Each structure stands twice: as structure tokens, then as C-alpha cells.
From Swiss-Prot:
One of its GO terms (cellular component) is ribonucleoprotein complex. Keywords: Ribonucleoprotein, Ribosomal protein. It comes from the Bacteria. One of its GO terms (biological process) is translation. The keyword Ribosomal protein applies. This is Large ribosomal subunit protein bL36. GO terms for molecular function: structural constituent of ribosome. The gene is rpmJ. Pfam families: Ribosomal_L36 (PF00444). The keyword Iron does not apply. Belongs to the bacterial ribosomal protein bL36 family.
């Protein structure tokens, strides 16, 4: 999982990317290509 300051550019890298908010953190998850996972930090 990558940890990035800004997730806006990562969101557009694949059409299946989803922005999810869990426990106050913002994540990008992708069910089909799992290497696109990221967390804002």
C-alpha cells in the first residue's frame, strides 16, 4: 500500500479505483488490480 499526501491523482489511474473513508483515514481501493491500494497520510 502506498501512503500519499494527495489521493486525487491516484484516483484517475484506473477506472475501478474507489475512494473509501474508514476510521478517519481516506483510502483508495481497487478490487480488480490490487496494486493500486493507497492511504492518505
Amino acid at each position: 500500500m502506498k501512503i500519499r499526501n494527495s489521493l486525487k491523482s491516484l484516483k484517475g489511474r484506473h477506472r475501478d479505483n474507489r475512494v473509501i473513508r474508514r476510521r478517519g483515514r481516506t483510502y483508495i481501493i481497487n478490487k480488480t488490480v490490487r496494486r493500486f491500494k493507497a492511504r492518505q497520510g
